[in-house]
UniProtKB/Swiss-Prot annotation:
Bias (Polar residues) ranges: 401-456, 484-521, 534-555, 568-641
EC number: 3.2.1.14
Comp. bias (Low complexity): 346-400, 457-483, 522-533, 556-567, 642-652, 659-672
Name by which UniProt lists this protein: Endochitinase 2
Entry similarity comment: Belongs to the glycosyl hydrolase 18 family. Chitinase class III subfamily.
Catalyzed reactions: Random endo-hydrolysis of N-acetyl-beta-D-glucosaminide (1->4)-beta-linkages in chitin and chitodextrins
Domain GH18: 29-340
Length: 855
């Protein structure tokens, strides 16, 4: 690979990593803000520095091709662009601005800060008029938007108003003309998004609150939108202010809109409550105070957690000028959202660049070194192990490393998990450690050996690719573990009052793993089984003092039953990796098992009869597999996901919600424990040539001492269940996946878990305009035939960004054009005009502008 190819690959990987810091589209507390039409507005980079903004909608494309000169669209971004326009090849002047140098410079900064930037079409300026007149016009308009404002491609020879920078999607704020053509545009854009499978693009709508919306109801009902920014202002019959004052006086409420969205082209689209940012931003009687906003947000976030997405604020400059307690209005609204969110999660995304690992543990501490490229909200620190323990672990040729460390008092414990893609031995030796567990998995042959003396606790760890696990015990504090997988291969070991136990497993796909435990004077047993194919391991033991069960699986179902036992194990099903950390306080105490969620998980919890205590904990989101069919003579159905077989157990009682009950233990003060899970998994997506499989690695962090388990909301009748944290479901059209264009539903990771906290350091940017000649290009060619397909409903996942106080910006605004707000309807938009002052400035600076424009 030459230097050029290496550089290109590095840029591509870096771009993907930066994108991973962006929006969590299915959180309940996202804040969207419109920008581009404020009087004397600050530039885009100033607002991107604000930690409260998740989505910034840039407005507007206010001239549509059917009304624009030469069949081109036109734009208006207030004072952020020079009065310079594109010309066609034959010399026709269009209304599309080509002097938006500040936006060109600011968009990459906004992307680096994790902001999602949408380009809005339409707007509500009184003197504007726009509409789509034909299906051909709708298709060409969508193609033009993607070519001009989407990712830069060598095939596009038309204009690029924002240069090489691209937006993250498009917003439809249609308040003029008719409702024709917009569903066609949305479906076409969904097809075009497939050309850039490494990035996520969004489509939003901003209807008036009156139902049905005159201009967007047809598009919302017949195409897939990700976000619905409802303008609950400027219409007294459905304003949010009126609902707060007297809910019974409102004709159309959030409840009505939720019902409508759940029957729309995307039943899992997120609803945003749109509010004016000040009394002057819209009708002054529709302005809500923070207390009034809290009332409506807390009510509907709790009532519709799967549909509620956050708030939309019109607009950024009005918010900046309306400060409450020193904070802009939008920042206050973000704080309202975060306070109302019952369970704001945290997460870490990691990209591994090196597989070398070295682990050494002295009698006082353990040091682990891993070369990784990571973005983390939790600083890493070395783990420590209690004195009187010596461990040595070597690993070579590995391709992915997982390390999880748990600390407790009397006794502390350390868990080390290492994965390898080649044959390697891993040996661990320990003398008198309170608790040590070593787990290694490999794609070929590997051996794990553990030796310990007088360990007071027992740990059983099972990893598999497709397994069922059941646990049962009768009239004994001991526990019986049985693991089954679909293919053949069985090894069974039974032990009664034996000081040591050896379990070996085998699978039909030339995988061999051995776990050996030697102990003296201890009733403990250590079992470790992992496979990517078929394995069956059954172990039975009596008179063991304590047992902990840890399960990791990729589609797995686990059922547990117990009669007259002292504890209850955990049962989980997952589509990826799951990590369970065990903490014990002494050799005589019962144990507690905490399990973390993994993508596409489902939990089944069983209860024992006649047991003095129960221990079970699982936090997960049920997953439904969504399939879509394209009607034709030979229907094509694309189904994503891998359903698992049902659980087989003698007696199973499933409670309505997972719960957590801690087993009795001795009174001991514990150190704070943090559970970190590194997950490597694969998913299917669509590229221009068809289906492709992508392998990713990401990390989640969980602190059981400070976090509380919240019962999963019961599924809404008729509504698909959302995917788990960090994952989302997209609906798109794949022309290459079947003989005819087919709508597919894909479960993929979000572009990021969360945006890490930013520092107070603020960049100082000096903007130097670069001379640039007007670009003269022809109108993009018209597209061919279009096949209308039915889109399926993407699933949802909920995750919340941690709030950070906004920082001020030292960036000086250098407007190159000028405009001020005029009369508006709905979401107000300014009409761009050349005022007298601007003309005088241009006349006075003729020489400079002549050089600037290349004349």
């Amino acid at each position: 690979m030459g230097p050029t190819n290496i550089l290109a690959a590095f840029i591509a990987v870096s771009s993907l990593f930066i994108q991973s810091l962006a929006l969590n589209p299915y959180a309940k507390s996202n804040l969207a803000v419109y920008w581009g039409q404020g009087a004397g507005q600050n530039r885009l980079s100033y607002f991107c520095e604000k930690t409260s903004f998740d989505i910034i909608v840039v407005g507007f494309i206010n001239v549509f091709p059917d009304q624009g000169p030469a069949g081109w669209p036109g734009s208006n971004f207030g004072n952020q662009c020079a009065d310079s326009y594109y010309y066609t090849k034959n010399g026709t002047k269009t209304k599309l601005l080509d002097g938006c140098y500040q936006i060109k410079e600011d968009l990459p900064k906004c992307k680096a800060l994790g902001k999602t930037i949408l380009l809005s079409l339409g707007g509500g300026a009184v003197h504007d008029f726009y509409e789509v007149k034909s299906e051909e016009s709708a298709l060409n308009f969508a193609d033009f938007l993607w070519g001009a404002f989407g990712p830069l491609t060598p095939d596009w020879t038309g204009p690029r108003p924002f240069g090489e920078a691209s937006v993250d999607g498009f917003d439809f704020d249609i308040e003029k003309g008719s409702n024709f053509g917009y569903s066609i545009m949305v479906r076409r854009l969904r097809e075009l998004f497939l050309q850039d499978p490494l990035n996520r693009y969004y489509i939003s709508a901003a209807p008036q609150c009156i139902m049905p919306d005159k201009y967007l109801s047809h598009a919302i009902s017949n195409s897939a939108f990700d976000f619905i920014f409802i303008q609950f202002y400027n219409n007294p019959s459905c304003s949010a202010k009126r609902w707060v004052t007297n809910p019974k006086s409102v004709t159309y409420t959030v409840d009505d809109w939720v019902k409508y969205i759940r029957k729309s082209g995307n039943p899992l689209a997120k609803l945003f409550i749109g509010l004016p940012a000040s009394k002057s931003a819209a009708a002054k009687e529709d302005y809500l105070t923070p207390g009034e906003a809290t009332k409506i947000v807390s009510t509907y976030m709790a009532k519709y957690p799967s549909t509620f997405g956050g708030m939309m604020v019109w607009e950024a400059t009005a918010s900046e000028n309306n400060k409450l307690g020193g904070l802009p209005y939008a920042d206050i609204m973000k704080e309202v959202l975060l306070r109302c969110d019952p369970d704001p999660p945290t997460s870490t995304v990691t990209s591994t660049t090196s597989a070398s690992t070295s682990t050494q543990t002295s009698s006082q501490s353990t040091t682990m070194e891993t070369k990784t490229l990571s973005a983390s909200t939790t600083p890493s620190s070395p783990s420590t192990v209690s004195p009187s323990s010596t461990m040595q672990t070597t690993s070579t040729g590995s391709t992915s490393i997982e390390t999880v460390t748990t600390r407790s008092q009397e006794p502390p414990s350390t868990t080390i998990s290492t994965r390898s893609a080649s044959t390697e031995p891993v040996t661990t030796r320990s003398q008198e450690p309170p608790s040590t567990t070593i787990s290694t998995r490999s794609a070929s042959t590997e051996t794990v050996t553990t030796r310990s003396q007088e360990p007071p606790s027992t740990t059983i760890s099972t990893w598999s690719a497709s397994t069922e696990t059941s646990t049962s015990s009768q009239d004994s504090p001991s526990t019986t573990i049985s693991t089954k997988s679909a293919p053949t291969g069985t090894v069974t070991t039974r032990s009664q009052d034996l000081p040591s136990t050896t379990i070996s497993t085998r699978s039909p796909e030339t995988e061999t793993e051995t776990a050996t435990t030697k102990s003296q004077g201890s009733p403990s047993i250590t079992l470790s089984t992992r496979s990517s194919s078929a394995e069956t391991v059954s172990t039975r033991s009596q008179h063991s003092s304590s047992t902990t069960i840890s399960t990791k699986s990729a589609p797995t179902e686990t059922g547990t039953t117990s009669e007259h036992s002292t504890s209850m194990p955990v049962s989980t099903r997952s589509a990826s990796t799951e990590t369970v950390i065990t903490r014990s306080q002494n050799s005589d105490s019962q144990s507690m098992t905490v399990s973390t969620r993994s993508p596409s998980t489902e939990s089944i919890t069983t209860r024992s009869q006649g047991s003095p205590s129960e221990t079970f904990s699982t936090k997960s989101v049920p997953v439904d597999t969504i399939s879509t069919e394209l009607p034709s003579q030979t229907p094509t159905t694309i189904i994503t996901g891998t359903p698992s077989d049902p659980v087989s157990a003698p007696t199973t009682t499933v409670p309505p919600n997972p719960t957590l009950t801690l087993a009795p233990s001795s009174s001991t003060t514990e150190d704070r424990t943090t559970i970190t899970t590194i997950i490597t998994t694969s998913y299917v997506t669509v590229c221009p040539t068809g289906f492709t499989t992508v392998t990713i690695t990401y990390t989640t962090t969980y602190c059981p001492e400070t976090a509380s388990l919240t019962p999963t909301q019961p599924p809404i009748p008729g509504a698909p269940a959302p995917p788990p944290d960090g994952w989302t479901t997209i609906v798109t059209v794949c022309p290459q996946c079947a003989p005819t264009p087919t709508t597919v539903t894909l479960t993929v990771p979000t572009r990021s878990a969360f945006l890490p906290a930013r520092t107070e350091t603020r960049p100082v940017v000096t903007v130097v305009p670069v001379p640039e000649n007007p670009i003269k290009n022809v109108k993009p060619s018209e597209s061919g035939d279009f096949v209308t397909v039915t889109t399926a409903a993407p699933a949802t996942v909920t995750k919340t960004l941690e709030y950070n106080n906004p920082v001020d910006s030292d960036v000086n605004v250098q407007p190159t054009g000028g405009s001020s707000p005029v009369e508006f309807e709905g979401s107000a938009m300014t009409v761009r005009s050349m005022d007298v002052v601007a003309k005088a400035l241009i006349t006075a600076g003729a020489a400079v502008l002549g050089l600037f424009l290349g004349l």
